[in-house]
Regions:
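Extended hydrophobic secondary-structure segments that form protein cores and membrane-embedded regions
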Residues: 87-90, 137-143, 168-173, 223-226
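Catalytic core of tubulin tyrosine ligase-like
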Residues: 219-223, 232-236, 241-403
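Conserved beta-loop-beta/alpha segment of the NTase-like Rossmann-fold superfamily
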Residues: 159-160, 164-263
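Low-complexity, highly charged intrinsically disordered N-terminal segments
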Residues: 8-66
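N-terminal nucleotide-binding beta1-loop-alpha1 segment
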Residues: 14-16, 73, 77-101
Length: 416
């Protein structure tokens, strides 16, 4: 092990790593220690996340969008046809809450018909490629856990009809977890306990994979970022793209009208005069229930993790560091004796960057309202709210079949 790594282990009094001061460290572990950012350890002593002053931010509502739809559509279609729009699928998660141990996008959302989440999202994107005759570059962010299976799944299913030359994969960066005393946790004898760096880390991970060159070579000027767990995501939506361009904003955020003041979604707002997202738990009752003159909620539009960013602005903020958020989580680990521990309560800190900070670092952002029944079908739980059941119902409501009619048994004789 390199002397400088040993010095850091000693200086930070690493309980689970001390034995490697005298023993030979596994190659994988040594590489992790060499490449990790040790300054993360200082953050656990300054965990408070300071937010600024929130104020409402008006959205472009459905009525205004409809009134100007032809103009926005023409502008957006022109951008897509000229190869200026790319898409980023954030797909690093597992389907754990669905009782599914593979990549979440591999989950079959159909009832008796095979309909995978990845398949439906690609079908949504294909609407635009069919409309424009142009393949939209699709960049899929995976994680260390599901990268191999995700790539294989796309290959096995022939990319669900998409042009494979326009699909690139990259792996989300991982960061170490530490216990409440600042000790780096070990997942195994040869590896730290690592976790993804949050949904704000996607652009840095894309750059580290060398795909910024691909963006430049293809002439991509706008990136539409969307999450894997909403099967009704409309991607590279030309009306959204056109409205954002016409507004003069450098970013756009798709939003839905909240069901009630306390719906558990982040709301678009201004923070110290800059575009931002206030989390539902950060809203005071007064803010949550505050209304405009027309009776609508001042913080009444929730984000659905579908954003549009101008690439040159992304490149500019990539040179700066996004704030790191420290969150408490349950992290399995092995101790210095090799004994495995699976805690039932939070035992460690994880470090995450958040996409809301990317929005905040933009000069402006257009909140763009969409019909929640047409564009918001989250798949977060096996049953109940935002579940497989509710997503299927919304798919069917939008004319997307989840039933295979070859499975239906027709009666051989009708009773009169």
């Amino acid at each position: 092990m390199k002397p400088e790594i040993k010095e850091k282990i000693t200086a930070t009094n690493q309980k689970y790593l001390k034995k490697f001061l005298t023993e030979e460290a596994p190659v994988k572990l040594e590489s992790q220690l060499e490449h990790m950012d040790w300054s993360y350890l200082d953050m656990i002593h300054n965990k408070e996340q300071q937010r600024g002053t929130f104020s409402p931010l008006a959205a472009m509502e459905l009525s205004e969008i409809e009134a100007n739809k032809d103009k926005y559509l023409a502008t957006g279609l022109d951008a897509v046809k000229n190869g200026k729009v790319g898409a980023i699928l954030l797909a690093g998660g597992q389907g754990t809450r669905l009782g599914f141990d593979k990549a979440k996008g591999m989950f079959n959302i159909g009832k008796t018909k095979e309909l995978y989440i990845f398949e439906q999202l690609v079908a949504n994107l294909m609407k635009v490629t069919n409309q424009t005759g142009t393949w939209v570059p699709l960049y899929v962010m995976t994680s260390e856990i599901n990268d191999g299976m995700t790539r294989e799944f796309f290959e096995e299913h022939d990319y669900f009809g998409y042009n494979k030359d326009y699909v690139k994969f990259f792996v989300q960066e991982m960061v170490p977890a530490v216990d409440f005393d600042g000790n780096l946790l070990m997942k195994s004898e040869d590896s730290l306990a690592m976790s993804p760096n949050g949904n704000g880390g996607w652009f840095k991970s894309l750059i580290n994979a060398g795909l910024d060159k691909d963006l430049k070579d293809k002439g991509v000027e706008w990136l539409n970022v969307f999450a894997v767990d909403n099967v009704l995501q409309q991607i590279a939506d030309p009306v959204f793209v056109g409205a954002t361009i016409e507004s003069g904003c450098v970013s756009g955020s798709k939003v839905v009208r909240k069901c009630d003041p306390y719906e558990r979604v982040g709301a678009m707002c201004l923070e110290n005069g800059k575009p931002s997202i206030v989390e539902y738990y950060e809203l005071t009752p007064e803010m949550a229930e505050a209304k405009n003159e027309n009776g609508s909620l001042q913080y009444g539009f929730g984000v659905i993790l579908n954003y549009l960013f101008r690439v040159d602005k992304l490149m500019a903020i990539a040179e700066k560091s996004l704030p790191l958020h420290v969150v408490e989580k349950k992290v399995p680990y092995i101790d210095e004796n090799g004994t495995e521990h699976k805690p039932e309560t939070p035992n460690a800190y994880k470090f995450e960057t958040l996409i809301l900070d990317m929005v905040y670092m933009m000069d402006n952002s257009l909140p763009f309202e969409v019909d929640r029944e047409k564009e918001f079908a989250p798949v977060k739980n096996a049953t109940g709210t935002d579940s497989v059941e509710t997503a299927r119902a919304l798919l069917e409501k939008n004319g997307i079949e989840t039933v295979s009619y070859t499975h239906l048994t027709l009666p051989t004789k009708l009773e009169v």
